[in-house]
Amino acid sequence: MRTVIQISDCHLSDESSFNRLRKALNTAQNETTCDTLLLTGDLCCNPRASDYQTLLAFLNKHIQNKHVYAIAGNHDDFILMKEEFRDSSIHVVEKAEIHGRQVLFLDSSAKPLDEHHPLGSGRVDNRGVARFKRQLRHATNPIVVVHHPIIPVGSDWMKAICLENDASLLALLAKHRVQDVICGHGHDALTVTKQGVTQHMAPATAYGFDHNIDEYNRSEKIGVNKIFFEDERIKVETIWL
């Protein structure tokens, strides 16, 4: 059975962050069943011009013969990402068919409209929501890929760094009977189900978060998610690096 490897929250900024990403890419390349990579946001930290081209060159050095899709996170510059990945091996798209399943990519990198959400929170903007509604009307049991969790999960401080319009998006998913969401942002492997929607969060490659600790923290626990797209549902296994 073919599989997908999800790589998230690389926070590329220094040599150590690239070394950790290398471990993830080598794991994906050596996984014989994997033919697709999902890069689920926070790829670069405070990105500047050419940073995504550097990531592209790094990925092409370690990954061959695999389809690669990317979305932006709150640390990314979505416009710069699209420009620097254009016509490359990393695809920034709104939807795709992967292993016979419809996959919808949702951009949550917009900043919240209110001032109550702390730095790191996100929002799906009005244009994105309108497009997502159109996609859902024409999709059959799609898989949704987004950076921020739609279902709040983890420690209280992580739940605060949330998606501003998460409640309305969850209601939309439930209305259209979407069963599976793939996300990042939480730097840990967490799975939760609410209103019939199961959300699968991947660990980061940069550093981990221990959600049992009541304040912001970092750990050395990094990894990727290995995802099986089955006929009706998906199955996720975490590979710790």
Model region roles, listed by residue range:
Residues 19-22, 51-56, 88-89, 124-127, ...:
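Charged helix-capping and loop-helix junction motifs
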Residues 2-11, 100-112, 143-145, 197-204, ...:
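Active-site-proximal beta-strand elements of phosphoester/diester hydrolases
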Residues 12-16, 45-50, 74-81, 111-116, ...:
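Active-site environment of divalent metal-dependent phosphoester hydrolases
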Residues 9, 28, 37, 42, ...:
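Divalent metal-coordination and catalytic microenvironments
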Residues 27-36, 67, 118-200, 234-235:
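His/acidic metal-ligating clusters that form di-metal
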Residues 18-19, 23, 171-175, 190-241:
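Binuclear metal-dependent phosphoesterase catalytic core
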Residues 1-58:
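N-terminal active-site segment of His-dependent metallophosphoesterases
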Residues 69-70, 78-94:
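Glycine/small-residue-rich loop that forms an oxyanion/phosphate-binding "nest" at active or ligand-binding sites
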